[in-house]
């Protein structure tokens, strides 16, 4: 094993299986240098490439954590990420880029599945109760949403399960059951039931307040997102008279951030729930 691979394994025990953080063998400054060279080589013939803007704290920034649930051949219930280019689950207890509270909640759910004698989804057989757990956290508000993606709408011992989960993690803001009973690689299904709380969380980004639902996309790195949006607006050299289209607008984070600087901005999106959230977010921010 090379020194670089040994270093990556020391930092993250599943780095060689997961494939998610492919530059883990480098220090963060080395990663930025590597990316700068790659982008520079690709684009330098067209335009000057400015230095990459890095993060002060490049760990545990990811405010959305998604874990697949399954069993090993020996029958052990596990949760984690899919191995690169496969649907094999790599058992993960914690991750260097994921929100710490989210990882702790997922570990608790793994234990509760065992203690409540619930089943986990068998992808080959197409049956089982728990398929995925999705956790979202508002970076500014600290509100936390837990989405239990299940293969059936029936939830044995539901009330007791939720009660114990909230006792272990009283800071959870809302819990939603999403039912996905189809043979599909898609994580979320169509039907949802709010089990606790209001069914969504809120967060503040670029001075705007946003409602975030289970199916709605929200940038996973809010610290860098604010920098990214700010630079995009700065480089656009807006005069305040422009009409702008925000394609794939999601819940309207770019749309509403841009609205302060232009005459009119149109958000376009295919996901219905995202548009519902976007309209609500426009009202919340008096747009």
Predicted regions, residues:
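SAM-dependent transferase fold signal centered on methyltransferase-like domains
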Residues: 1-193, 234-241
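Rossmann-like S-adenosyl-L-methionine
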Residues: 2-5, 157-287
